Amino acid sequence: MTASLVVLPSLWLILIIFTAPYTHCTQSGIYIDNGKDQTVMERVLTDDDKLDVSHEILEFLGIAARPLHHKSHGLSLRKSAPKFLLDVYYRITAEEGLAIKNKSDHSRSKRDANESEQNFITDLDKRAIDESDIIMTFLNKRNHNVEEMRHEHGRRLWFDVNNIPTDNYLMMAELRIYQNSNEGKWTTTNKQFTVTVYMLRSGGSAPNMLEPLSSVNTTGDYVGWLELNVTEALHDWRVNSNENHGIYIGAHALNKPEREIKLDDIGLIHRRTKVDDENQPFMIGFFRGPELIKSTSGHSTQKRTKRSTLHQRKKSKSEPVNPFIENSIENTRSCQMQTLYIDFKDLGWHDWIIAPEGYGAFYCSGECNFPLNAHMNATNHAIVQTLVHLLEPKRVPKPCCAPTRLGALPVLYHLNDENVNLKKYRNMIVKSCGCH
């Protein structure tokens, strides 16, 4: 048997999905430990209960509304931007050592061996990944209505950045373009080129002025991703969306900067690139967000009060089903980490959360009795409190069993049909327990 739970601190509610492997039925409800190393159902949760919990957790995680239904994760993951985030996701889970269940249609820990993995996540990316809370990707909008450029050799790209939350601080933004020398005109290391990204600005007599942002050097035989810094452009677009006229990509020979060459000649941004092409150009934004786990006080109190009232009205439909449960079960085991599994699928989130399908959250449970052993990770204060409790048990309580170390949970999800986000929720997974 497997048991999975969802803990919601603001409601003090535990939702557990319990599946028997030899049957085809699944029940959702509240399960508790009966003190004899057995997990038993205390009561069944109705569909309304689960919907209530789902809304509460969305608010708890700082997601304003449930993203729209997405038909196929597999189709979207063929695109370049989601593939990048999927690699980032697996890198984070590997470093955190998370016990996470992932869907079978994308259960890979790295890109295919024939792909240029070594330059897909750079050292600069790794630092930005570690420091950021939210990573957003943006694909080029091919159908955006813009004026044609007079520069026939380069390419113009445009990204819709209107969905970025205003309270997120931009750390860095990168443009990724793929070079495939096999499709180019020059395929030798003797040919060196400079690729430059420009921000398109309007003003004056010229309809579009080119403001250089960054450049990168490459060779004619290079195959892989090129990274260009576009932080200034994304920052300006967020301040004033009317200034978002896109960017322009140009290239020239290293020894002839005055002569622009066709990007096709060095295998860059081919005109026949499809929307779902895994080498489609994309932009990455690394952000530091506010505390992602929202406070349980303030403006949301009224909403929770209404839902709690609704929960009380529905309680008659979900009364205890096990008459052998004693409400005053005392856990006599010493403080230790217990298994707790969160299942997103039972909340109906499998159509917009790409990964994970579920994760091990764990929890701390048990007594902090004298003497406090080494495995209890007791603080000095807890040791003193235990001794005082022996002398004055009615005045001073025993120390509490609580997490001593917590880990982050990465969640990869569809914002809409065009954009995929990766959020890191800190302090979501118990790593160790102790007496405090």
Swiss-Prot record:
Listed InterPro entries: Cystine-knot_cytokine, TGF-b_C, TGF-b_propeptide, TGF-beta-rel, TGFb_CS
Q: Where is the composition biased (Basic residues)?
A: 301-316
Cystine bridges: C335-C401, C364-C433, C368-C435
**GO terms, molecular function:** cytokine activity; growth factor activity
Glycosylation site residues: N102, N114, N217, N229, N377
**Mind telling me which GO cellular component terms the entry cites?**
extracellular space
Q: Which domain of life is it from?
A: Eukaryota
Entry keywords, A to Z: Cytokine, Disulfide bond, Glycoprotein, Growth factor, Secreted, Signal
Establish whether keyword Cytoplasm is in the entry: no
Q: Which residues form a coiled coil?
A: none
Matching entries from SUPFAM superfamilies are given as: Cystine-knot cytokines (SSF57501)
Instruction: Identify the PROSITE patterns for this entry.
Output: TGF_BETA_1, TGF_BETA_2
User: Which ranges of residues are annotated as propeptide in this record?
Assistant: 28-317
Instruction: Provide the residue span(s) of the region labelled Disordered.
Output: 293-322
Signal peptide span: 1-27
What broad class describes the main subcellular location of this protein? secreted
CDD domains named in the record: TGF_beta_BMP5_like (cd13761)
Q: How does it assemble?
A: Homodimer; disulfide-linked.
Q: Which family would the database say this protein is a member of?
A: Belongs to the TGF-beta family.
Q: What is this protein called?
A: Protein 60A
- Its source organism is Drosophila virilis (Fruit fly)
